[in-house]
């Protein structure tokens, strides 16, 4: 059966075909049939490739390109980003910082700024770089914050900033990321690679061979709307086929999740509820059943794995805790009845079973453990390396699972200095501090400078940095515990932010420089992050608005101030670079993919290389583990890691274990005071915080102008809350306002506020309520363990009540308070 967009959409009961394309696009499509004025240009985004109708110098309409058969409704929000009232329009400097020249931090966050010229702003930026390198050294400058940026091979804003700043002097940077910090650290010890960003078994192989698919804390229907590069959305065709197979009883799909997520509602598959943050006890009990009932694949364990005996001794209660991890032990913790645990374990070994893990589950305290334990369960099943079997950690991300064509995409603008180059301040003395820090521990540097922490087998001494340069990312979205951040930012002398949107990060900065959006400059990008379906020309749709500039131009002008502009740009313009990147790409793909000359490509705008060949992850390892070893120390799957064991960590030991959380709902620590688990997962209508500023699109989901909080109707009734009421959500770390949405997709004791909601404090003071609904006002800022030191955002419990006070205005949007 041919898979169409309609066949996919009709399964989502809460989403109509019109809403996915977007009413404004459907409404304007008929008018466009007779539109003869203006031009259409192709461009791209994290939300997919599109054609934009340009008339009178403005973007009038956006339509997905023909290759995208399952476009996301978020394309409707792109116009709202370009023309948002929250655009950074002019270079701005914080009033008190400029006025007092003493790096006054007590009023940081009051959003009062002075407009200055570009020359004044860049002079101040350069002055601060000089001062910090001269007075302190490279340890005092942090320029390592990164995020999703915008798409495009050339215009990577972080690369532009770090090359320019790096030409001036060295600086503190980071390792890891917020999305998969725990997972990408633990899995190389267990499976030999980070796995989370690796291409997975092709969907076609899974659909053809799997009898059971376990979606463990995984919501691909929601998350596949966006991609790291310009996304194709080809995965949705496979999900449509999966829906048909579920309906016919050909594949058994079970969602293991505290909530009934969008994918479960679309597929209409079975749902197995597990108490939040208790998947590990459930997994340990599964391992107990598989072992005691002799259901595990002993031959696979003996041939491909190391350390099973130590792990199974722990499961049997033969180690120091003396607790046997039976289903009866796990049931009161995880909320799954003992008989159901046994039934689930037995099902896993009946036929071919594919486990598909999500990322949210590892963003918690001890987040390394569920990924490690899941790998052990998959090893006991014994199907790793078989079509439709084994385990994946990425089938909800970008186009993982869509066969790759093998096309080698274009390179990018160089982040590092060219060979032989040295910075103006060629100083490598970091004063005993670590040059690289775990990405989620930077606030600790400000509050506990000089502290030595464990990290991944080594030691990190937290640097006492004084200045930050932030480009194209929003740490006041992706980091945790806003009030702790407020306290930490009092320690900073200077914060420079380069962005196109006035985020909370801009609010808490000292110098803000207006970058343009990706649709106000030219670029190229791979079409399909993992499928490498083709290549997209990203045409500039309109000229940069207000006084915004491309990052390339901003950094050229900065490097002019210390005589390095020509070296920075290599004497090339934007289009010189794009042409060069294309030609290098053409050369590297010679004999494999036919690519026209650049001018023809630029006019054509889209190169389509078709679909790739199916592939099975770990098949080569299974075929011959000696010739094709994993990247672990032994080359085998390490159920027990002696290397980790030698680290001597308390909270991440030599094999997967259950560690109680510092706080947990459903009878866990702290639940008597704050009984509800707050799930702050990836949003359905944004890419993290990108698109929250798009006013018309935000209005399609906001509740009374606030971020939605999803509540079980019985929990809401107990607190006198009705649909649409304003709700105050709170704990000891902070408080926020959100709009109530009542739904039985969320069990009692669980609420959801999606991450990426823009922080809008009522004031700069610690403890001020967030007026819009940023969940990171409430989350705790602790490392997952000594191993990964990753974010633990989902270890968060709260309480809530109907808000009955005077309703404050939302302060998140609209830019700064400009002071003459």
From Swiss-Prot:
Source species of the chain: Vibrio vulnificus (strain YJ016)
Identify a single GO molecular function assigned to this protein.
electron transfer activity
- Could you confirm whether the keyword Transport appears in this record? no
Known catalytic reactions: trimethylamine + 2 Fe(III)-[cytochrome c] + H2O = trimethylamine N-oxide + 2 Fe(II)-[cytochrome c] + 3 H(+)
Q: Where in the cell is it found?
A: Periplasm
List, alphabetically, the InterPro entries matched: Asp_de-COase-like_dom_sf, CT_DMSOR/BSOR/TMAOR, Molybdopterin_N, MoPterin_dinucl-bd_dom, Mopterin_OxRdtase, Mopterin_OxRdtase_prok_CS, Prok_Mopterin_Oxidored, TAT_signal
* UniProt remark on cofactor binding: Binds 1 molybdenum-bis(molybdopterin guanine dinucleotide) (Mo-bis-MGD) cofactor per subunit.
As recorded in Swiss-Prot or TrEMBL, the protein's gene is named torA
Which cofactor does this sequence's record say it needs?
Mo-bis(molybdopterin guanine dinucleotide)
> What job does the chain carry out?
Reduces trimethylamine-N-oxide (TMAO) into trimethylamine; an anaerobic reaction coupled to energy-yielding reactions.
> EC annotation?
1.7.2.3
Q: Which residues form the signal peptide?
A: 1-33
Keywords assigned by UniProt, alphabetized:
Metal-binding, Molybdenum, Oxidoreductase, Periplasm, Signal
What is the protein name for this chain?
A: Trimethylamine-N-oxide reductase
Family membership: Belongs to the prokaryotic molybdopterin-containing oxidoreductase family.
């Amino acid at each position: 059966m041919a898979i169409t967009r309609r066949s996919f959409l009709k399964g989502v009961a809460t989403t109509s075909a019109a809403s996915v394309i977007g009413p404004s696009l459907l409404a304007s499509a008929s008018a466009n049939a007779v539109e003869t004025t203006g031009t259409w240009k192709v461009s791209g985004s994290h939300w997919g490739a599109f054609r934009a109708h340009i008339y009178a110098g403005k973007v009038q309409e956006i339509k997905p390109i023909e290759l995208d058969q399952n476009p996301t409704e978020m394309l409707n929000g792109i116009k709202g980003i370009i023309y948002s009232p929250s655009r950074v329009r002019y270079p701005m400097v914080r009033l008190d910082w400029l006025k007092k020249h003493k790096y006054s931090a007590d009023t940081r966050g009051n959003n009062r700024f002075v407009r200055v010229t570009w020359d004044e702003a860049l002079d101040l930026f350069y002055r601060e770089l000089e001062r910090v390198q001269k007075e302190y050294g490279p340890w005092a400058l942090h320029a390592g914050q990164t995020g999703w940026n915008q798409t495009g091979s050339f215009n990577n804003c972080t690369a532009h900033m770090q090359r320019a700043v790096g030409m001036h002097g060295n600086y503190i940077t980071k390792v890891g990321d917020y999305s998969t910090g725990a997972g990408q650290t633990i899995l190389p010890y267990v499976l030999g690679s980070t796995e989370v960003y690796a291409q997975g078994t092709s969907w076609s192989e899974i659909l053809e061979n799997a009898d059971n698919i376990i979606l463990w804390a995984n919501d691909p229907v929601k998350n596949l709307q966006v991609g790291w590069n310009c996304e194709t959305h080809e995965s949705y065709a496979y999900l449509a086929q999966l829906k048909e197979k579920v309906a016919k009883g050909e594949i058994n799909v079970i969602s293991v999740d505290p909530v009934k997520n969008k994918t479960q509602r679309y597929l209409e598959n079975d749902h197995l509820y597990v108490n939040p943050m208790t998947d590990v006890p459930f997994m340990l009990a599964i391992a107990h059943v598989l072992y005691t009932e002799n259901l595990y694949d002993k031959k696979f364990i003996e041939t491909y794995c190391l350390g099973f005996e130590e792990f199974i001794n722990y499961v049997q209660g033969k180690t120091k805790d003396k607790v046997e991890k039976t289903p009866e032990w796990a049931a009161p913790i995880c909320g799954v009845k003992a008989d159901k645990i046994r039934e689930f374990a037995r099902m896993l070994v009946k036929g071919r079973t594919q486990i598909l893990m999500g990322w949210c589950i590892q963003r918690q305290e001890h987040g390394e453990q569920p990924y490690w334990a899941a790998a052990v369960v998959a090893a006991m099943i014994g199907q790793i390396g078989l079509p439709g079997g084994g385990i994946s950690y990425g089938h909800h991300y970008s186009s993982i699972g869509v066969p790759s064509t093998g096309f080698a995409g274009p390179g990018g603008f160089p982040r590092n200095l060219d060979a032989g180059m040295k910075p103006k301040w060629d100083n490598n003395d970091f004063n005993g501090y670590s040059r690289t820090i775990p990405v989620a521990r930077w606030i600790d540097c400000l509050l506990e400078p000089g502290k030595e922490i464990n990290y991944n087998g080594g030691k990190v001494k937290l640097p006492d940095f004084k200045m930050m340069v932030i480009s194209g990312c929003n740490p006041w979205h992706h980091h945790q515990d806003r009030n702790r951040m407020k306290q930490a930012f009092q320690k900073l002398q200077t914060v420079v932010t380069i962005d196109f949107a006035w985020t909370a990060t801009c609010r808490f900065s000292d110098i803000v420089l207006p970058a343009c959006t990706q649709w106000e400059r030219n670029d190229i990008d791979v079409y399909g992050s993992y499928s490498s379906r083709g290549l997209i020309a990203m045409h500039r749709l309109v000229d940069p608005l207000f006084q915004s500039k491309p990052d390339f131009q901003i950094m050229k002008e900065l490097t002019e101030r210390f005589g390095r502009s020509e070296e920075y740009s290599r004497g090339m313009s934007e289009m010189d670079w794009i042409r060069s990147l294309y030609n290098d790409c053409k050369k590297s793909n010679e004999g494999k993919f036919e690519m026209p000359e650049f001018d023809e490509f630029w006019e054509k705008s889209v190169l389509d290389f078709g679909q790739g060949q199916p592939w099975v992850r770990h098949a080569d390892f299974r075929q011959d583990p000696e010739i094709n070893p994993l990247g672990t120390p032994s080359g085998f799957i390490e159920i027990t890691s002696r290397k980790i064991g030698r680290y001597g960590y308390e909270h991440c030991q030599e094999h997967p274990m259950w560690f109680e959380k510092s706080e947990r709902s459903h009878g866990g620590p702290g639940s008597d005071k704050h009984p509800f688990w707050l799930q702050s997962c990836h949003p359905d209508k944004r890419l993290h915080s990108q698109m929250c500023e798009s006013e018309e699109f935000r209005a399609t989901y906001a509740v009374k102008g606030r971020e939605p909080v999803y509540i079980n109707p019985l929990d809401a009734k107990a607190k006198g809350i009705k649909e649409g009421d304003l709700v105050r959500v709170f704990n000891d770390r902070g408080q926020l306002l959100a709009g109530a949405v009542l739904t039985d997709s969320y069990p009692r004791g669980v609420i959801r506020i999606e991450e990426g909601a823009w922080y809008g404090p009522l004031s700069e003071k610690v403890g001020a309520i967030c007026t819009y609904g940023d969940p990171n006002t409430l989350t705790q800022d602790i490392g997952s363990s000594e191993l990964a030191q990753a974010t633990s955002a989902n270890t968060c419990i709260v309480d809530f009540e109907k808000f009955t006070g005077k309703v404050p205005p939302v302060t998140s949007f609209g830019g700064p308070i400009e002071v003459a």
